Swiss-Prot record:
GO terms for cellular component: cytosol. The keyword Membrane does not apply. It catalyses: an N-acyl-D-glucosamine 6-phosphate = an N-acyl-D-mannosamine 6-phosphate. This is Putative N-acetylmannosamine-6-phosphate 2-epimerase. Its EC number is 5.1.3.9. The keyword Magnesium does not apply. Converts N-acetylmannosamine-6-phosphate (ManNAc-6-P) to N-acetylglucosamine-6-phosphate (GlcNAc-6-P). Signal peptide: none annotated. Belongs to the NanE family. GO terms for biological process: carbohydrate metabolic process; N-acetylmannosamine catabolic process; N-acetylneuraminate catabolic process. InterPro entries: Aldolase_TIM (IPR013785), NanE (IPR007260), RibuloseP-bd_barrel (IPR011060). The lineage of its organism: Bacteria, Pseudomonadati, Pseudomonadota, Gammaproteobacteria, Enterobacterales. It comes from the Bacteria. Gene3D superfamilies: Aldolase class I (3.20.20.70). The gene is nanE.
Amino acid sequence: MSLLEQLDKNIAASGGLIVSCQPVPGSPLDKPEIVAAMALAAEQAGAVAVRIEGIDNLRMTRSLVSVPIIGIIKRDLDDSPVRITPFLDDVDALAQAGAAIIAVDGTARQRPVAVEALLARIHHHHLLAMADCSSVDDGLACQRLGADIIGTTMSGYTTPDTPEEPDLPLVKALHDAGCRVIAEGRYNSPALAAEAIRYGAWAVTVGSAITRLEHICGWYNDALKKAAS
C-alpha cells in the first residue's frame, strides 16, 4: 500500500486532522524534545500526520511517532520572500532526517531555486511532494509540475493584510480542479476545520490553535479584556 493510500485509509477512519507542531520561536516550548512530545500527543489523540519544522525537531519527532511527518525548513533570505524549504540541500536534509512528505513554497515569487526543481528533488528521494500555495493559479501550476499535495498554507500571507478567516473558497476551487488539498492557515476552531472538509479538503492542518500556547492565551486574554471593558 502506498503512503497516499495509507493516508486515505487513515483519513477515512480518523477525520483528517494534521497537527503542525511549530512553537513560537524562542518560546520555552521551542525545544526538540518538547516538539516531539507534542507530536506524539497529537498522534495519540488521532492526528493522521504531523508537520514539523527544522532538522533537529524532525529527527527527534521521527524517533517517537509512527504517523507520516510533513517536513519543512524555514529560512529568512535577503533576496527572496520565500521561506519554506527554498533550497535543494534543504530537501536532501529533510529526506535524510525522516520526512515522508516534504513541503515547499509553491508561490510564483522570486526564489533561489525553481519549484519544479524542488519537486523533482523530493521525488528523487521517493517521497511525497507538497506545495504550499496562495492561489488557484499557484496550486494548478504546482500540480502540473508534479506536486502530489496542494496546501492552502500561503493564502493571506503573500499580501500586506492577512484576513482573520481561512480561505475556504480556495479549498473548494482547488478541489474542484482535481487537486488533493490540505487546508491550512487560520483554521483556529473545530468548526472551521470541519467546514474545510465540506469544501473538499482532503485533510486539515491546525497549528496555532493546538500547539502555540502564546497565541491561544492571547485569544483568551483579548476576549476577557473586551468583556471587562
